[in-house]
C-alpha cells in the first residue's frame, strides 16, 4: 500500500450485505492498485465482509431502512438517516474525498446525499437488472450511474448511465482460470448450493428432501457444499448425515469462489453478485429467484443468464422436492449439457468490470462528464 493517497481519497458506500459489499471490494482493489486511498462507509452488519479493508478505513454510518407506514417508525427512520447525514458530513470534511461511490442499500443514502450537497462528485453502481429503491432515490442527484445488468440505452437516466458489468473480487478472477471439467456418469458429482451472503431457508429444507428421493446409487455420487443460515445449519447437516451424503454445511464460506470453481453444478438464488460470479467463473446453474424481492430484481438477473443458455430458472413455487430431484438427477446424468451451459455462462461474464468501473470513477473524480467518458475523453 505504499502508493496510497498519491491520487487522493475515494469513499465507497455500501449496504452491509455481500451483494453490496463484494463489488465494492472489487473496485477498492482496482483503485488501490492505481494509487487511490479507498475508504468504506457502511452499516454495522458489514463486519464479516470487510476483511479487504483496513479497520481504520471502515466507517460505520448511522442509517435505517424505510419500511412500512407507521408514523412513529418512519420518524425514527428519518431521524437515523439525518444522523447518518451528519456522520457523513463530518467524515467527508476530514477525508476530503474526490469521489463518493454508492453500491446500493439504504446505508448509502446518507453518504451520497451528504456528498452531493457538499459538491463532491458522486457515482452509483446498480448491480441488478432492475434499479433498487435506494439507488432510485439517488439517481437524479448523482453525476453518473454504472450498471451491472441494467438495460443499455433505456430509461430516464440513460444519458448518464454506463454499463460496466458487476466487479468481481480477485479470488473470483483466480477461480475463473479453472476450466470446467464435467463429471463422468460414475464420478463423484460436486453440488454447490447457496442463497447469497445471507443464506436461504428454502434450500435448507428443499435440497435434503430432494436428495432423499434420488436412487441410492446416485446419492452415493454426491458431494455437497451448502451455505445455510445459522438457524438452519444443524438440521441441514443432520439430514445429509442420515442420508449418508457427505456435506459441508456452514453459514458462510470465505473461499466461495474456489468452491464454485470446484463444483459441477450450482443451485443458487440470483442476486447480481451471485450471477456475476457464476458467469465469470463459468459454471452451469439452476437459479431460483427470491420470490419476495420487492423489485423482482432477482428474476430479471436470472432471465439475463438464462437467455444466454447458461442457467435454468425455476420459480420457488414450482420447485417441489420431486421436481428438484428430477432436475438434479438430469444434471448428474447429462454432463455434455452441463458443459455447454458452463461455456454459455462464461461467454457472458465480464471479468474486466472492475477495470471499467474504475475508469469511470476516475473520470468522474477528475470532473469529466459521462458523455465525455463515453466519447473516450478520460483522465
Swiss-Prot record:
Molecular function per GO? UDP-N-acetyl-D-glucosamine:N-acetylmuramoyl-L-alanyl-D-glutamyl-meso-2,6-diaminopimelyl-D-alanyl-D-alanine-diphosphoundecaprenol 4-beta-N-acetylglucosaminlytransferase activity; undecaprenyldiphospho-muramoylpentapeptide beta-N-acetylglucosaminyltransferase activity
Which Gene Ontology BP annotations are present? Answer: carbohydrate metabolic process; cell division; cell wall organization; lipid glycosylation; peptidoglycan biosynthetic process; regulation of cell shape
Recorded superkingdom? Bacteria
EC number(s) recorded for this UniProt protein = 2.4.1.227
Q: What is its main location?
A: membrane
**Pfam families from the entry?**
Glyco_tran_28_C, Glyco_transf_28
Q: In which pathway does it act?
A: Cell wall biogenesis; peptidoglycan biosynthesis
Instruction: Kindly give the InterPro entries that the UniProt entry links to this protein.
Output: GlcNAc_MurG, Glyco_trans_28_C, GlycoTrans_28_N
GO CC, alphabetical: plasma membrane
Where in the cell does this protein reside?
A: Cell inner membrane
Keywords from the named record: Cell cycle, Cell division, Cell inner membrane, Cell membrane, Cell shape, Cell wall biogenesis/degradation, Glycosyltransferase, Membrane, Peptidoglycan synthesis, Transferase
Question: What residues bind UDP-N-acetyl-alpha-D-glucosamine, as annotated?
Answer: 17-19, 128, 169, 197, 298
- Indicate how the chain sits in the lipid bilayer: Peripheral membrane protein
List, alphabetically, the SUPFAM superfamilies matched.
UDP-Glycosyltransferase/glycogen phosphorylase (SSF53756)
Q: Which reaction does it catalyse?
A: di-trans,octa-cis-undecaprenyl diphospho-N-acetyl-alpha-D-muramoyl-L-alanyl-D-glutamyl-meso-2,6-diaminopimeloyl-D-alanyl-D-alanine + UDP-N-acetyl-alpha-D-glucosamine = di-trans,octa-cis-undecaprenyl diphospho-[N-acetyl-alpha-D-glucosaminyl-(1->4)]-N-acetyl-alpha-D-muramoyl-L-alanyl-D-glutamyl-meso-2,6-diaminopimeloyl-D-alanyl-D-alanine + UDP + H(+)
Q: Which PANTHER family match?
A: GLYCOSYLTRANSFERASE (PTHR21015:SF22), UDP-N-ACETYLGLUCOSAMINE--N-ACETYLMURAMYL-(PENTAPEPTIDE) PYROPHOSPHORYL-UNDECAPRENOL N-ACETYLGLUCOSAMINE TRANSFERASE 1 (PTHR21015)
Q: What role does this protein play?
A: Cell wall formation. Catalyzes the transfer of a GlcNAc subunit on undecaprenyl-pyrophosphoryl-MurNAc-pentapeptide (lipid intermediate I) to form undecaprenyl-pyrophosphoryl-MurNAc-(pentapeptide)GlcNAc (lipid intermediate II).
Q: Which family does it belong to?
A: Belongs to the glycosyltransferase 28 family. MurG subfamily.
Listed name of the protein:
UDP-N-acetylglucosamine--N-acetylmuramyl-(pentapeptide) pyrophosphoryl-undecaprenol N-acetylglucosamine transferase
State the species of origin. Answer: Brucella ovis (strain ATCC 25840 / 63/290 / NCTC 10512)
Quote the gene name from the UniProt entry: murG
